[in-house]
From Swiss-Prot:
Region ranges (Reductase): 145-371
Pathway: Cofactor biosynthesis; riboflavin biosynthesis; 5-amino-6-(D-ribitylamino)uracil from GTP: step 2/4; Cofactor biosynthesis; riboflavin biosynthesis; 5-amino-6-(D-ribitylamino)uracil from GTP: step 3/4
Higher taxonomy: Bacteria, Bacillati, Bacillota, Bacilli, Bacillales
The name this protein goes by in its record: Riboflavin biosynthesis protein RibD
UniProt keyword annotation of Hydrolase present: yes
Keywords: Hydrolase, Metal-binding, Multifunctional enzyme, NADP, Oxidoreductase, Riboflavin biosynthesis, Zinc
The enzyme's E.C. designation: 3.5.4.26, 1.1.1.193
Role noted for this protein: Converts 2,5-diamino-6-(ribosylamino)-4(3h)-pyrimidinone 5'-phosphate into 5-amino-6-(ribosylamino)-2,4(1h,3h)-pyrimidinedione 5'-phosphate.
Gene Ontology molecular function: any one: 5-amino-6-(5-phosphoribosylamino)uracil reductase activity
Highest taxon listed in the record's lineage: Bacteria
Amino acid sequence: MEEYYMNTAIELARRGEGQTQPNPLVGAVVVKKRQIVGMGAHLQYGEAHAEVHAINMAGSLAKGADLYVTLEPCSHYGKTPPCAELIMKSGIKRVFIAVEDPNPLVAGKGITMLEEAGIEVKTGLLRQQAEELNKMFLHFMRTGLPYVTLKAAASLDGKTATETGDSKWITSEAARLDAQQYRKSHQRILVGAGTVKADNPSLTCRLPDAVKQPVRVILDTKLTVPETANVLTDGAAPTWIFTAAGSDVRKKDRLTALGIKVFTLETDRIHIPEVLSILAENGIMSVYVEGGASVHGSFVKAGCFDELHFYFAPILIGGTLAPSLISGEGFQSMKDVPHLQFTQITQIGPDIKLTAIPKDGKDGDDVYRNR
């Protein structure tokens, strides 16, 4: 039954997906005499935490009850008071925590507060599932870098468009809808200037339940993106541009006047680790990279990705000049290429979605998540 209660808390936490960052996804359940008497989830950044909703719902029944929570309760004052204090005041006798919070503001302090108050604390229940739930938050807190997901759609022979650039549409509507879920769950959508010039995308989440739009990030070495592009003019979401030293200063001023945030790097090329460091400094914990091929190649070459989503359609495009999934410098030796482990293979309509994470190809250790 303990696993059932924690799984219920995990499912509750999912309701806040795409709405709580930079906060984690958290769900909580209050149980008394084997009955759920309170439940809650953190649904939006700045609003009440899961434990608050669950304990308030339980009311007086919280006294002597058990609390199941997906992440260690906070112990500090932020936008809301510390949940650990509320738990102590409520009379909860036992707390089951799936994962400890690596945030330096918490990092075991919540557990210590509860234990010093005489509350029994047990950790690790459904740890793996809870880690997966909050992989972006946990990765950011542990490494100081955003969680990076690479996404691409291609024909079965790995082509993302025909030789003429025609790419609408390679994959089915069902596959494109699936990708929208990840636009919702990531804080930033990133593409290169070539994608903007070729497709003029809006790069927004079109799901009806999307509470807020991810900020659009454009990598544009020479600041060549058209000033009439949708991402600069539609007002649907903020847009950030990373450009290299020597790019057009007057154009930068015009873009800034439009409300576009422009980051000018000190080098004549855009280095992916530097981009991620700047994003991290701005509190960004997740990035959804949608290409194009040279951008994907840069992330792969730099070893700067944590997950990969490739959608393959049952079509063949061919053509020597037709663009492929990944371009750029590539690798000169097989001993240097990144090895991946498939975590999921799913059929979505007529298409196949491959989900993978980087591995070193030897002992199964994840080489990029701890970079």
